[in-house]
């Protein structure tokens, strides 16, 4: 979130231009290799928390752990949204509020915000298992399609962790 703070807002005074110079470098966003690595990491964490741990914890009756996995899944979904929009993510408390302000994704941002809001309102219990799974898988579809549309990777599996190897290889090739 420090990078988001550094590039947003207004600089009131920088007589020597030192901060402005660094700020312009930061505004160019992450180098492509770093960007690919961050996308790979975030895809993996989204899958781990929402597509793997959440269903496991529910099946085991560990609903507090399931809620934690659900929250982590939402957090990583929002961070992935920022990455795909080439925008630094703000502090966690501002992640959701900033989502509509990111126009670069080819999908309508309202789909993403509505799904995240829906996930946040659903309890991570057995009674809502299908509804929660469907919402998380819908996010995975949106992100997989976006990764393909932006030509970041070839064909993306809906289990986003499967995309991490290709992203890491692209990062290493740069």
Short names for language-model regions:
Residues 65-67:
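Solenoid-repeat scaffolds in large eukaryotic assemblies
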Residues 87-88, 153:
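Short, polar/charged, Gly/Pro-enriched helix-capping and turn/loop motifs at alpha-helix termini
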Residues 1-60:
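Conserved NTP/Mg2+-binding pocket subregion across the NTase superfamily
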Residues 36-39, 118-174:
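Long, low-complexity C-terminal extensions of enzymes
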Residues 71-74, 81, 88, 92-116, ...:
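Small-residue-rich helix-loop
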Residues 49-56, 114-125:
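Solvent-exposed, amphipathic alpha-helical segments
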Residues 54-60, 78-86:
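Acidic catalytic cores of enzymes that act on phosphate-bearing nucleotides/polynucleotides
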């Amino acid at each position: 979130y420090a990078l988001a703070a550094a590039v947003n807002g207004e600089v009131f005074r920088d007589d020597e231009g030192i901060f402005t110079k660094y700020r312009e470098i930061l505004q160019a966003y992450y180098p492509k290799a770093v960007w690919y690595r961050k996308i790979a990491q975030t895809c993996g964490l989204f899958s781990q928390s929402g597509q793997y741990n959440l269903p496991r914890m529910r099946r085991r009756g560990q609903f507090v752990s399931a809620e934690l996995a659900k929250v982590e899944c939402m957090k990583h979904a929002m961070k992935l949204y920022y990455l795909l929009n080439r925008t630094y993510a703000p502090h966690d408390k501002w992640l959701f509020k900033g989502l509509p302000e990111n126009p670069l994704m080819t999908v309508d941002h309202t789909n993403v915000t509505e799904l995240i809001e829906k996930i946040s309102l659903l309890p991570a219990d057995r009674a809502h298992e299908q509804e929660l799974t469907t919402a998380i898988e819908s996010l995975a579809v949106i992100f997989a399609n976006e990764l393909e549309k932006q030509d970041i990777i070839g064909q993306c599996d809906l289990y986003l962790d499967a995309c991490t190897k290709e992203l890491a290889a692209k990062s290493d090739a740069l």
